[in-house]
């Protein structure tokens, strides 16, 4: 069976940060309700009593989108080459991918301080599973026994990257042209990891008259 999903999110800064990092709820609660949304020049107004607090309406202009994709699948095959012997292979995959794109325009207080800020990040996770088993069962009169032997293997892959820039000429590029920013040291990072787990297992059961069991 396989299941594929894709979700798109328009993120809203609801966080409980302080000052220029305040989220919409914090800013709305603390902002002076008598101050108009925009001033006479059409810019977002600031709170005279708390100039470091962003205008809560301006935070709605932050462009912050996330895409999440997932593939979850499993399959198995079982054969019986001879009577009493069953061979089974079970395979599974869990792939998760997400990408986030953020742009803080100059109309926001924090974006104005840095002349616009863009950020991109993505991560890819791939997990694989393989189980192989051999199960043999035999009955001789009042005696019966069962032997199971198996091998299990799991592999985990993770890789990701992030990049950003600020100091843009205008807000039109959003996060689609990081090279247009003029920040002297734009942040760039990447990472990757691989790990695996393997094991062998076995079991032996002997029964006599279906009353006594040795394992």
Task: Identify the function of each model-found stretch.
Residues 2-4, 210, 215:
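Generic low-polarity alpha-helical segments
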Residues 80-82, 139-142, 209:
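Outer-membrane beta-barrel channels and translocator barrels
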Residues 74-76, 80, 133-135, 148, ...:
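Outer-membrane beta-barrel architecture
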Residues 78-87, 92:
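A conserved hydrophobic secondary-structure block that centers on an alpha-helix together
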Residues 1-70, 88-199:
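Surface-exposed loop/interface segments of Gram-negative outer-membrane beta-barrel transport/assembly proteins
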Residues 90, 201-207, 213-214:
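Exposed, low-structure sequence patches enriched in small/polar residues
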């Amino acid at each position: 069976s396989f299941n594929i999903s894709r979700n798109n999110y328009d993120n809203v800064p609801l966080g409980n940060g302080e000052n220029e990092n305040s989220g919409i709820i914090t800013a709305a609660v603390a902002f002076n309700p008598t101050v108009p949304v925009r001033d006479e020049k059409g810019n977002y107004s600031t709170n005279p009593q708390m100039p470091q607090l962003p205008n809560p309406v301006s935070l709605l202009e932050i462009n912050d989108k996330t895409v999440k994709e997932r593939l979850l699948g499993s399959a198995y095959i079982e054969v019986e080459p001879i009577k009493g012997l069953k061979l089974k292979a079970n395979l599974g995959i869990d792939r998760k991918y997400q990408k986030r794109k953020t742009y803080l325009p100059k109309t926001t207080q924090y974006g104005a301080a840095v002349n616009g800020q863009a950020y991109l990040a993505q991560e890819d996770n791939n997990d694989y599973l393989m189980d192989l088993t051999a199960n043999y069962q035999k009955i001789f009169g009042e005696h019966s026994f069962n032997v199971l032997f198996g091998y299990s293997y799991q592999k985990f892959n993770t890789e990701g990257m992030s990049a950003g820039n600020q100091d843009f000429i205008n807000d039109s590029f959003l996060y689609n042209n990081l090279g247009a920013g003029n920040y002297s040291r734009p942040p760039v990072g990447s990472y990757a990891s691989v790990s695996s787990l393997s094991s062998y297992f076995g079991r032996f059961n002997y029964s006599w008259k279906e009353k006594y069991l040795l394992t």
